[in-house]
Amino acid sequence: MKVEISKDLEDLIPGYLDGIRKTIQDFKDYLSTEDWENLRIHGHRMKGSGGGYGFHFLTEKGKQIEDAAKESDGASIQSAITELDDYLNSVEIEFVESEDW
């Protein structure tokens, strides 16, 4: 999957994605202990941050995790985690001039 990101954010993206990778590991840990509240909180944070950096898929998956945590739906959360892992392993980032973004 290819994502276009503003060149203005180029220096921030590696750190942001490292944080997302840590969040995904946290999701796995929270799911293993059925910590629905932390899953909800961190899903909400991912939902809020993804689009701001141009990663709308992260926003969608954050919302899925947040909503599923409210229902204690571990299967849906596990599915989202798997999709997030796959996404981060395959996403291609193209940095574009701000007026194009």
Features from the language model and the residues they span:
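Amphipathic, coiled-coil-like alpha-helical segments
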Residues: K2-V3, K7-I24, S49, Y53-E60, ...
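Extended, amphipathic alpha-helices with heptad-repeat/coiled-coil or helix-bundle character
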Residues: T23-E71
